[in-house]
Amino acid sequence: MRALKRVVLWIGLIAVTAVPAMAVDSLYHAAVPVAGTSAAARNQAIAAAAAAVLVQLSGNPDVAIQPGVATALASAPALVKDYHYTEGGNGSLMLDVGFDPQALESLARRLALPVWPSPRPPVLVEIRIDGHPADAAALAGLVESGAARGVQFILPHAGAPAAAGVAACQHDALAQLARDYGTGLALVGQISGGDGSWTLVTGDTCQSWQSVSTNTTSVLTAAGNAAVDRLVARFAAAPAPAGGQAGALWVGHLRSASQYAAVMALLRNDPRIRSVRPMAAEGDGLLLSLQLDAPLATVAADLAASGHLVSAAPQPGADVSLDWVR
């Protein structure tokens, strides 16, 4: 490999390259009913909102009954970034609470909760019911069940990659998925007479299963929860030992300083990555040394599902190899 001269050149170029700022993540917000505007009622609602956010961060709907969680939620008001009162759909009073992301993730680590950190890519949903594409109304229950656990299901637009190609994890279909939807995650399904056939695509991995129900709404909601269960199992990481762990990551198809800057920003914004250090470069690829709070395989799988990167052929000296898509 070439010496680090090229890496230094790229670093110099980034000084004049703008990197888009990330949007505020809804993972750290929750709206809950509140009994009134008194401090006591507000603090009780804030604790409930913090529990809802921990569900979103961990993907575990039963997080509130985990050991130590109820006690820890008593300090939730100290973690609040902002809040405001709103009116619910039935006229009830609601409290919309935003928490400090670092404070909430720190709380989750202290409670030893597995966390799938932000930013999370959306999950494209391509489902046919009795041969016809499912519309937004039919998928409302699935979308709502995912949102409660911090997963955004999105519907395809015209020109979406062929469902068959996505479900088969074909490289071209996954690259189009990344370019068009900014994700490497998809749920492809067919329902016929209540029987469901499902494939969840996570980066370059496909998982398939069957379901049976006499109720289409129930089978869709169950499929959404099953997909979230699999996503959480794949991407949510428990706290690492104090010393962390090291790994070598190869990123290929970097053809400009702006792409290099985008990769570095993506890695440095991941709370599981303590440090990123360029080691060597060759052609349009870069070898990076990472210090992590989670296994590199877990982090790399998340990166491959982010819509920015796809799995690549193994490279010398790298534990994991990825190619830049956009």
Please tell me what each predicted stretch does.
Residues 66-125, 137-140:
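Signal peptide-directed extracytoplasmic domains
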Residues 25, 44-59, 111, 148-150, ...:
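C-terminal/domain-edge helix-coil "capping" segments
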Residues 78-85, 152-157, 166-199, 303-319:
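A short, hydrophobic beta-strand-centered structural micro-motif
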Residues 28-35, 177-224, 298-300, 320-326:
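Amphipathic beta-strand/beta-sheet edge segments enriched in Tyr/Trp
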Residues 33-37, 78, 88-90, 98-104, ...:
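Solvent-exposed coil/turn segments that connect beta secondary-structure elements
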Residues 8-18:
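Bacterial N-terminal signal peptides
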Residues 19-23:
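Sec/Tat signal peptide C-region and signal peptidase I cleavage site
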Residues 46-68, 119-170, 263-287, 304-305:
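N-terminal segment of the mature soluble domain
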